[in-house]
Amino acid sequence: MGCSVVGNCKSVMLMSRMSWSKLALLISVAMAAAMTDSPPTLICMGILVSVVLNWIVCAVCEEASELILGVSLETTRPSPARVIGEPVFDPRYGYVAPAIYDGKSFDVILPISALSSASTRKETVEMAVENSRLQPLESSQTPKSLVALYSQDLLSGWGSRIKGPDGQEYLLTALHVWETNISHLCKDGKKVPISGCPIVASSADSDLDFVLVSVPKNAWSVLGVGVARLELLKRRTVVTVYGGLDSKTTYCATGVAELENPFRIVTKVTTTGGWSGSPLYHKDAIVGLHLGARPSAGVNRACNVAMAFRVVRKFVTVENSELYPDQSSGPARELDAETYTERLEQGIAFTEYNISGITVKTSDREWTTAEALRVARYKPLGGGKAWGDSDDEDTQETAIRPLNLPAGGLPTGQSALGQLIEYAGYVWRDEGIINSNGMPFRSAGKSSCRFREAVCRAVHRDVRAAETEFPELKELAWPSRGSKAEIGSLLFQAGRFERVEAPANLQLAITNLQAQYPRSRPRSCFRREPWCREDFVAEIEKIAHSGEINLKASPGVPLAEIGVSNQQVIDVAWPLVCEAVVERLHALASVDPRQHDWSPEELVKRGLCDPVRLFVKQEPHSRQKIEQGRFRLISSVSLVDQLVERMLFGPQNTTEIALWHSNPSKPGMGLSKASQVALLWEDLARKHQTHPGAMADISGFDWSVQDWELWADVSMRIELGSFPALMAKAAISRFYCLMNATFQLTNGELLTQELPGLMKSGSYCTSSSNSRIRCLMAELIGSPWCIAMGDDSVEGWVDDAPRKYSALGHLCKEYEACPVLPNGDLKEVSFCSHLISKGRAELETWPKCLFRYLSGPHDVESLEMELSSSRRWGQIVRYLRRIGRVSGNDGEERSSNESPATTKTQGSAAAWGPPQEAWPVDGASLSTFEPSSSGWFHLEGW
């Protein structure tokens, strides 16, 4: 109640201050106006009077605000000398003890009465530490986030201001300090009352002893208290602790802080009475909370409070997401259920803490929670061995049982993959084929992992209003959403699929195309066989925390049962995700699903892959597509499968992105800089001189990709990436799963494709594989050159190309010669939704960008990034200024291709990662890959 009243008073005060200031200004202006008949000097005097009057009003309001908030001056009182250590016997004086006064340390002689109590006391509150001296400070030298805490007129301890993820500011201090009935915050000699503020989180355990209190912003702002960052302590760290007799008479001491266990810190920093609750500062961040002393060990105690919040995960923001660079050797490894049981059997003792209702168990080096103990982990069957310890012979399929896997390659019992299947709650039932033409789909059952059935968005009123200025907007609208739209569009796209046999010249085309791509080197964890589990875990964690994963995206099926985003799943279930990736990579390398001809349903049942979640992409569609029900579908693979693909194919994809200018695939291409446009244009112009160019448009590319095209792609990946044997097997099995997928709709309905093929648009490999497959298609029909970005391409002209593409199973709806100048040189090309010419790349799909911008509260900078190169940009900016969406210099016209950021094109986001070293491999060939009668490839030695 007290906090609420203070907050309301503060709001009234601010409004009052603003009104009086404006009134004073108006009076002064009126005075100046009245003097208009006088010389200009009198007008200047009137303005000066207005400034002074305004300053007086502001000062009065400031004092009034402090009065309303109950701000008072801190009472300073002399402090007695404090005994800060155990008494020792000195033959000359008797018993003496170290003491401190006014920041100086000295010994005092103890009387017999004091000796009696001091000698029987087990623990002092604070402790002086050798080589850690108190340094007197001016109050301005203390951290802005530090505050003194008073119980009426008595200094009880210290605290700090930290910020939570919800934007709320909290007071962090020791619980035993807060329990002294803290009534005031104090900073620089000013006190403000805070009684009645609620506790948000706390722990009464003596090793933790912290409390988090919700304090209104008004109390912080009137004292000028800043906000500190909270970070996890990293091993042995130099820290500084602050305290004093009051908020103006302050000291600091510096020393080393170390972890005793993941939550308990010991410091060699001198403190004195009344310093409890003071933060441990490392540079400008808080890395711990001072609690008291442990004189028997000659150290002070502190809490690794950031670790406590890392476990709770909801109250405050911890800046450093990784506790140690190498957590495998650091003293803060989180345990799974089985390892925890093993530790108990080994006689390792665990201390139990309670943090806001969450039970934490910790040893000196490891910790877990009661929640985690309910999550079972992989446990080898009796008599078996871990797959990382297998030898070369064990990698064959006959060795599955000794590797603790049943026939089919799925770890059972307490495996991570088994848990994923359990979370999904699959109910399999064959309800027959649901369509009669194209790619057949079978209704296979349902899962318990459901998603929200969203409704179609209405066109925003700002879009409607802009249609008179930009008639092109009339042709756009938002697509339908939900399972009904998904199944309708799926059947429409599937109906156009036509399966064809691999052409006779496929192997020659593969050989010719492969020579145009760079080679790469596998991740180090794959290069050593048999595989080492610890190496895999380290590499997977590196990928997950490198920024490669879109943390806002859905984790897919079945991990959406745990969290709605990748970030949430990684936060609460990372051990499960990481273990599932390790197990899946092993399972993929342990079997050849082609030999069993496993169906999409069986692949999911055996843990080799997860269902592909199908949903309609929320982007503006043409009204023609909406009327046809031909929505753009995203086939989103699960977080686990994405990590599997990144592990296998990341180095090759990264190499191709870094070297986009020297290979046919262009996912790494950017068009935001003139140098990038020039590089692309020079390549196209040179190729055009050797053979005239053509622009082709393949309709529904993802839904027409053939299985033999995917096999060709993975064969080139294996060769170019120098995949070792186990890695090659895992890659082949992953592509088998990719081309034989189980789809899941929003309502949980499961559909299986009955023929192999189709590119999954949400796969990590989509952009890279589509680009290579598109270039392969051009090679197959005899085109002398080709560049491709996904399904977009520019290639050397081929007579009768649409018919030849049709023979490969692809519908080429447009095939046009590139425009040329009178002298025959290339004039321009349409590529990746851009009209590209010498020195210019102009986005052609500007209506979609403007439609999106007008549909919500977007920044003009994001629009400028996409449209600054458009010929319509000037008209767009003028219109936006007219309706008030842009002001000042926002959206100023720039010269061609000087947009502030990269033009958004397929795969361009990945282009800005650090380039990976290309790894030369000599003497490689594709002779081990030959198409069988079914058109599939076989790896020699299987």
From Swiss-Prot:
Sequence positions bearing Phosphothreonine: T339
The protein's name: Replicase polyprotein P2AB
Biased composition (Polar residues): 897-908
Assigned GO CC terms: host cell membrane; membrane
Organism annotation: Cocksfoot mottle virus (isolate Dactylis glomerata/Norway/CfMV-NO/1995)
Disulfide bonds: none
Disordered: annotated segments: 888-917
Site location (Cleavage): E130, N131, E319, N320, E397, T398
Catalytic reactions of this protein: RNA(n) + a ribonucleoside 5'-triphosphate = RNA(n+1) + diphosphate
Gene Ontology biological-process annotations: DNA-templated transcription; proteolysis; viral RNA genome replication; viral translational frameshifting
The keyword Transmembrane helix appears for this protein: yes
Peptidase S39 domain residues: 129-326
